[in-house]
């Protein structure tokens, strides 16, 4: 039976999981709490892929006190050998009496298997405590598993009249330092950041996390069908972060890019569906698309997005570049999104949207 106290302990487990948001890819972000006789005896979170899972960390901290205790975990414990052994085996060995799970594994081949194994071992299992919060925490992982592609965030900065750049392509800087700091937090949570080659040519960005502390850098991906990227571009400095150039050309320039440590992916079928399929194979779980207007338009037009984050500055540009033609000819055909959150960032606004 689920009680109010179960929700409190699960919220603690969720807060532990959030500490590692962005660092566990391609694994989910998971937290765990072990409670015995009303006292917390073990806390854990999954640090990164290849490291012990949250349940194992919490059980290790609890030690002998795990016998007869309750384990709270934000995602169904795994039953398979991956980078680490199954968590269900560790739970059964520990002597845990009850397990409370926030949400089931999204993989249809695995969903419910962990719960079933624990119940077959005589352990009481309850599922669905803080489920909505747990699913939202790992929405990137759920999409990655169920859609067979990365979770996609489209992010852009615009003026009050909806312009993303001037007619010459200039976009530095539309928004404030406060907005750029939040943008770097979003980068930190992503597995990879993607731009079109025009953005590299016009802005020469680093595409790294710089304004906030970080333990890792996202993979930088450039869509460059004709291999136009300048060899002097900052994004090609692979000492800062890994870089992938996706193209349909195979020539001498591709070899020069490889010499610089850049991974060059040559796709004959150069389209978003094939690109996203390849990125899934490369374990890119959360892809943040940062532009420019042409690249953002292509993702919107083909419906490849899960979240949109728009930074709005109190500036009016008049003529300029904005989201392009989506093939929409009536208001009824407009892409509809759901507002999730609005924040004030100095003079700017940032609005988070989810697709319906």
Curated annotation (Swiss-Prot):
<feature type="binding site">
    <location>
        <position position="187"/>
    </location>
    <ligand>
        <name>substrate</name>
    </ligand>
</feature>
<feature type="binding site">
    <location>
        <position position="199"/>
    </location>
    <ligand>
        <name>NADP(+)</name>
    </ligand>
</feature>
<comment type="similarity">
    <text>In the N-terminal section; belongs to the cytidine and deoxycytidylate deaminase family.</text>
</comment>
<dbReference type="InterPro" id="IPR004794">
    <property type="entry name" value="Eubact_RibD"/>
</dbReference>
<keyword id="KW-0378">Hydrolase</keyword>
<dbReference type="InterPro" id="IPR002734">
    <property type="entry name" value="RibDG_C"/>
</dbReference>
<feature type="binding site">
    <location>
        <position position="157"/>
    </location>
    <ligand>
        <name>NADP(+)</name>
    </ligand>
</feature>
<dbReference type="GO" id="GO:0008270">
    <property type="term" value="F:zinc ion binding"/>
</dbReference>
<dbReference type="InterPro" id="IPR024072">
    <property type="entry name" value="DHFR-like_dom_sf"/>
</dbReference>
<dbReference type="InterPro" id="IPR016193">
    <property type="entry name" value="Cytidine_deaminase-like"/>
</dbReference>
<feature type="active site" description="Proton donor">
    <location>
        <position position="55"/>
    </location>
</feature>
<feature type="binding site">
    <location>
        <position position="53"/>
    </location>
    <ligand>
        <name>Zn(2+)</name>
    </ligand>
</feature>
<feature type="region of interest" description="Reductase">
    <location>
        <begin position="149"/>
        <end position="356"/>
    </location>
</feature>
<comment type="pathway">
    <text>Cofactor biosynthesis; riboflavin biosynthesis; 5-amino-6-(D-ribitylamino)uracil from GTP: step 3/4.</text>
</comment>
<dbReference type="GO" id="GO:0008835">
    <property type="term" value="F:diaminohydroxyphosphoribosylaminopyrimidine deaminase activity"/>
</dbReference>
<comment type="function">
    <text>Converts 2,5-diamino-6-(ribosylamino)-4(3h)-pyrimidinone 5'-phosphate into 5-amino-6-(ribosylamino)-2,4(1h,3h)-pyrimidinedione 5'-phosphate.</text>
</comment>
<feature type="binding site">
    <location>
        <position position="171"/>
    </location>
    <ligand>
        <name>substrate</name>
    </ligand>
</feature>
<keyword id="KW-0862">Zinc</keyword>
<feature type="binding site">
    <location>
        <position position="87"/>
    </location>
    <ligand>
        <name>Zn(2+)</name>
    </ligand>
</feature>
<dbReference type="GO" id="GO:0050661">
    <property type="term" value="F:NADP binding"/>
</dbReference>
<dbReference type="InterPro" id="IPR011549">
    <property type="entry name" value="RibD_C"/>
</dbReference>
<dbReference type="InterPro" id="IPR002125">
    <property type="entry name" value="CMP_dCMP_dom"/>
</dbReference>
<dbReference type="InterPro" id="IPR050765">
    <property type="entry name" value="Riboflavin_Biosynth_HTPR"/>
</dbReference>
<keyword id="KW-0479">Metal-binding</keyword>
<keyword id="KW-0686">Riboflavin biosynthesis</keyword>
<comment type="similarity">
    <text>In the C-terminal section; belongs to the HTP reductase family.</text>
</comment>
<protein>
    <recommendedName>
        <fullName>Riboflavin biosynthesis protein RibD</fullName>
        <ecNumber>3.5.4.26</ecNumber>
        <ecNumber>1.1.1.193</ecNumber>
    </recommendedName>
</protein>
<feature type="binding site">
    <location>
        <position position="78"/>
    </location>
    <ligand>
        <name>Zn(2+)</name>
    </ligand>
</feature>
<dbReference type="Pfam" id="PF01872">
    <property type="entry name" value="RibD_C"/>
</dbReference>
<feature type="binding site">
    <location>
        <position position="290"/>
    </location>
    <ligand>
        <name>substrate</name>
    </ligand>
</feature>
<keyword id="KW-0560">Oxidoreductase</keyword>
<keyword id="KW-0521">NADP</keyword>
<feature type="binding site">
    <location>
        <begin position="292"/>
        <end position="298"/>
    </location>
    <ligand>
        <name>NADP(+)</name>
    </ligand>
</feature>
<feature type="region of interest" description="Deaminase">
    <location>
        <begin position="1"/>
        <end position="148"/>
    </location>
</feature>
<feature type="binding site">
    <location>
        <position position="207"/>
    </location>
    <ligand>
        <name>substrate</name>
    </ligand>
</feature>
<dbReference type="GO" id="GO:0009231">
    <property type="term" value="P:riboflavin biosynthetic process"/>
</dbReference>
<feature type="binding site">
    <location>
        <position position="173"/>
    </location>
    <ligand>
        <name>NADP(+)</name>
    </ligand>
</feature>
<feature type="binding site">
    <location>
        <position position="210"/>
    </location>
    <ligand>
        <name>substrate</name>
    </ligand>
</feature>
<keyword id="KW-0511">Multifunctional enzyme</keyword>
<feature type="domain" description="CMP/dCMP-type deaminase">
    <location>
        <begin position="4"/>
        <end position="126"/>
    </location>
</feature>
<dbReference type="Pfam" id="PF00383">
    <property type="entry name" value="dCMP_cyt_deam_1"/>
</dbReference>
<dbReference type="GO" id="GO:0008703">
    <property type="term" value="F:5-amino-6-(5-phosphoribosylamino)uracil reductase activity"/>
</dbReference>
């Amino acid at each position: 039976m689920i009680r109010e106290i179960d929700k409190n302990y699960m919220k603690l487990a969720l807060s532990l999981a959030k500490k590692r948001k962005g660092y566990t890819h391609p694994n989910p972000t998971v937290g765990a709490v072990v409670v015995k006789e009303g006292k917390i005896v073990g806390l854990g979170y999954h640090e990164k892929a290849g490291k012990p899972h949250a349940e194992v960390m919490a059980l290790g901290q609890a030690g002998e006190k795990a016998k007869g205790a309750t384990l709270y975990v934000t995602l169904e414990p795994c039953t398979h050998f991956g980078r680490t052994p199954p968590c269900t085996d560790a739970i059964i060995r520990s002597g845990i009496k009850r397990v409370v799970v926030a949400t089931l594994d999204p993989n249809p081949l695995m969903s419910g298997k962990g719960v079933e194994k624990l119940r077959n071992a005589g352990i009481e299992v309850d599922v669905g405590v803080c489920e909505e919060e747990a699913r939202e925490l790992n929405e990137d992982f759920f999409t990655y598993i169920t859609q067979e592609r990365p979770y996609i965030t489209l992010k852009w900065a615009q003026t009050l009249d909806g312009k993303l750049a001037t007619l010459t392509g200039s976009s530095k800087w539309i928004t404030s330092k406060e907005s750029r700091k939040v943008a770097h937090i979003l980068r930190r949570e992503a597995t990879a950041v993607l731009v079109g080659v025009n953005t590299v040519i016009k802005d020469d960005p680093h595409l790294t996390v710089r304004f906030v502390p970080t333990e890792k850098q996202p993979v930088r991906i450039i869509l460059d069908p004709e291999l136009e990227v300048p060899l002097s571009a900052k994004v090609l400095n692979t000492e800062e972060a890994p870089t992938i150039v996706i193209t349909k050309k195979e020539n001498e320039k591709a070899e020069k890019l490889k010499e610089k440590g850049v991974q060059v992916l040559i796709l004959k079928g150069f389209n978003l569906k094939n690109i996203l399929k390849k990125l899934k194979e490369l374990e890119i779980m959360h892809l943040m698309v940062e532009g420019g207007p042409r690249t953002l338009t292509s993702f919107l037009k083909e419906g490849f997005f899960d979240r949109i984050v728009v930074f709005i500055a109190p500036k009016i540009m008049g003529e300029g570049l904005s989201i392009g033609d989506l093939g929409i000819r009536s208001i009824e055909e407009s892409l509809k999104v759901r507002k999730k959150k609005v924040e004030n960032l100095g003079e700017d606004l940032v609005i988070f949207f989810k697709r319906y």
